């Protein structure tokens, strides 16, 4: 009985955390769309501020807990680039995409990408994963199927696809880390580096 109660509590905790993550994930899209649609800030500046503020917050949290921070200049560049890819494509896609549509596409692509990565890693697909990938793929097909009463920019949809792939790979790489907070902080510093490089090209050529 105690084991069953513990399992129920763990499942409820997991459901609660997943629900909370989904709420923040969806709110992220709503706030991004609200910011970019006003045209008071461009997509790159919005992305740069997001990465900079995230880096500052995570660095502060890590230093508060561990009193010091050591950034490894030789690792986490792929993880950092994937986070940057997620963030920059996410912002530019919302120039011409509704928040709800973008969220649905992002959720589906992230799920599909993570399952594909799992398959390449020789992980076995459970029934739940098969149901999940079927729902995600079916939802994408329904959403993107041409209809007279609904139109969508396929270029901005492509950007959201890239954003979802970037987030999925970033998450998979982070899963392998022994210290999630340190790994995420280090990756964000690398993402900030890629944002600065992109910013130089943005200022010079756009």
What are these regions (language model features)?
Residues 12-17, 45-60, 132-135, 155-162, ...:
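Hydrophobic alpha-helical transmembrane segments of multi-pass integral membrane proteins
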């Amino acid at each position: 009985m105690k084991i069953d109660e513990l399992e129920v509590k763990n499942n409820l905790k997991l459901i609660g955390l997943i629900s909370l993550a989904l709420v923040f994930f969806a709110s992220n899209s709503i706030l991004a769309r609200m910011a970019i649609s006003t045209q008071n800030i461009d997509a790159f500046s919005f992305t740069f501020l997001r990465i900079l503020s995230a880096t500052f917050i995570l660095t502060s949290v890590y230093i508060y807990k561990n009193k010091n921070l050591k950034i490894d200049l030789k690792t986490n560049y792929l993880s950092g680039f994937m986070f940057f890819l997620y963030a920059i494509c996410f912002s530019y896609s919302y120039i011409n995409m509704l928040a709800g549509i973008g969220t649905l596409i992002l959720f589906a692509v992230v799920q599909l990408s993570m399952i594909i990565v799992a398959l390449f890693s020789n992980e076995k697909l459970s029934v739940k994963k098969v149901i999940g990938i079927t729902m995600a793929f079916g939802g994408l097909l329904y959403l993107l199927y041409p209809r007279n009463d609904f139109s969508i920019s396929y270029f901005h949809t492509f950007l959201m696809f890239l954003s979802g792939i970037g987030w999925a790979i970033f998450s998979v790489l982070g899963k392998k880390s022994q210290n999630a907070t340190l790994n995420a902080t280090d990756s964000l510093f690398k993402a900030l580096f890629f944002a600065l490089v992109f910013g130089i090209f943005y200022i010079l050529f756009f």
